[in-house]
Amino acid sequence: MAKRIIYNEQARRALERGIDILAESVAVTLGPKGRNVVLEKKFGAPQIINDGVTIAKEIELEDHIENTGVALIRQAASKTNDAAGDGTTTATVLAHAMVKAGLRNVAAGANAITLKKGIDKATEFLVGKIQENSKPISDSNAIAQCGTIAAGNDDEVGQMIANAMDKVGKEGVISLEEGKSMTTELEVTEGMRFDKGYISPYFATDTERMEAVLDEPYILLTDKKIALVQDLVPVLEQIAKTGKPLVIIAEDIEKEALATLVVNRLRGVLNVAAVKAPGFGDRRKAMLEDMAVLTNGQLITEDAGLKLENATLDMLGTGRRITINKETTTIVAEGNEQAVKARCDQIKKQMDETDSSYDKEKLQERLAKLAGGVAVIKVGAATETEMKDKKLRLEDAINATKAAVEEGIVPGGGTTLAHLSPILKEWADKNLEGEELIGANIVEASLTAPLMRIAENAGSNGAVIAENVKTKPFNDGFNAATGEYVDMSSAGIVDPAKVTRSGLQNAASIAGMVLTTECIVADLPEKKDSAAPAGAPGMGGDFDY
C-alpha cells in the first residue's frame, strides 16, 4: 500500500492535532467535578464512563497521522494503567502539556535531543522528590480515602475496599463480580490467586479487557505435560454433555493439544481455558494439591495411579468463578471451608518441622494463598450502563489502594506536582544549562496542568489557583469539590505516590519521543468508491454480507 511521508514541523503539528483531540476528550473527566463521556458502541447500549484509559482506547481518527498522535498519548495512559492501575487521566493531561510546550521550543529552533535530555533529568529528580514526600499508609482510614478519591469521590466504595483489605489483608485478593441487586455488597469466600495467565490469548472471553471469565467451571488439575489431545478426549466429551466451562491447569500443554482446545473454544463447541501450573518441581505439585483441596477435586498424577485418559467428572474440581488474564489466575471457590482449614493446619505443621528458611518461606507463601481467601465485591446498579461505569471506578479504586500500600501516599488533587514545580525550577537553574535547562523548564511548566484542569472542571480559574497553591505549604492544596484551600491529608484528598510517579514518567517518556520526531510514514487514506453496489433483486442494498 502506498505511504504518505511527512517531515519536520508539518509532521509534529499533525501529531499535535491528534494529541489535542484525545487529551481534551479525556481531560473533561478529571477531578471531583469532572464530567462523563458517552461511548457509542457498534453493538449494545452506549457506555457512559469517567475512566481515562477506557475513553483513550475508544478514540480512532480518520486521518492516519492524527491517529498516530492519539496512539502515542494513549500509550502514556495504558502504561500508567498497567503499572499503577489509576492516574491515566493525569498522565494524559501531563503528556499533552509537555508536548505543547516542547513543540513551541522546537519550532523556535531548540535542539529536540538536548531538550529530551533535560526532560529526562528533570523527571528523574522529581521521581526522587515524590518518594521523599510520600507517607506510608498506616490505617484502614487512609486506605478508604485513597479508594474514595480513585472512585470519583464515592465514600461507600472507599469504605468497602478498606473493609475488604481488613478481611483478606493488604496483599489479599479482591475480585469484582456483577451483583444481582441494586446495592453493592462485600463477601469473603475461599479462593486463591497465582501468577500464571492463560497459555493462549484465544481463551479470552472478554476481548476488550483481554481476560477469560468462566462461571461455575469444572477444573482439571494435572502435573503432567499434555502433548496429545487424545489424552483429553474422554474428559472433554463428558464435559461437553454438561454444557459447563472447563479450566485446565497443567504443567504445560503442547502445540497439537493446545491448537485443538483453541479451535473448540473459537467454534463454541466447548468453553475452555488452559493455564500453566505455578511453581517448579515438588512445589508445583504441592500447589496443585492445594488447588485440588480448594476446589474439591483430585490432582490427576501418575504417582497416585491416576491417568488423564481415565479421568471422570467426579475427579474434577469445581469453582464459583475463575478469572484469567495474561498474568494471573484467580479462583473463587465456596463450600470447602473444613477441607481448606485442614490443609492449612497441615502446612503449619510442615513449617514447624522444617529447619530450612527457604522451605519455611515457600510454605508461608502457600499458606497465605490458601488461607487468605478472596474478597468478592458484588457490584450493584439500576441499569447495565451504570453497572459498567461503577465497575470501572471500583477497579481504579482497588488498584489505587494497592499502589498506596506499595509506595505510600502524597497530597492529591494535583497538589504534589504543583508544589514540586518551584522546587524543580530552583534545582534546574543550579544544575542544568542551555537547552537542557529549557527541557527541565518544559516539565516545570507542565506540572501545574493537572491542578489547573481539575480547577477548570470545577468552574474556577486554573492559572490563579495553581499560583496560589504554589505559595502554600506542601500539604495544602485546592479542594475542587468545595472550592476551598485545605490541608489535603486532613481532608482525605490523597493520591498513591506510585500513581503520581508512573503518570509523570510515562508522560515525560511520550513527550520526549514526540519532540524528537522528524518524519512520519503513514498509510495514504483509501479512496472511497462514489457508487456503492446495489443489493441483489429483492434484497436491501445496505446489508453487510
UniProtKB/Swiss-Prot annotation:
NCBIfam families given in the database record: GroEL, PRK00013.1, PRK12849.1, PRK12850.1, PRK12851.1
Keyword Oxidoreductase: no
Xref: InterPro entries: Chaperonin_Cpn60_CS, Cpn60/GroEL, Cpn60/GroEL/TCP-1, GroEL-like_apical_dom_sf, GROEL-like_equatorial_sf, TCP-1-like_intermed_sf
Protein's name according to its UniProt entry: Chaperonin GroEL 2
Annotated localization: Cytoplasm
GO cellular component, one term: cytoplasm
EC numbers for this chain: 5.6.1.7
Complexes and interactors: Forms a cylinder of 14 subunits composed of two heptameric rings stacked back-to-back. Interacts with the co-chaperonin GroES.
Binding locations of ATP: T29, L30, G31, P32, D86, G87, T88, T89, T90, G413, N479, A480, A481, D495
Keyword field: ATP-binding, Chaperone, Cytoplasm, Isomerase, Nucleotide-binding
Enzyme class, broadest EC rank: isomerase
Similarity remark: Belongs to the chaperonin (HSP60) family.
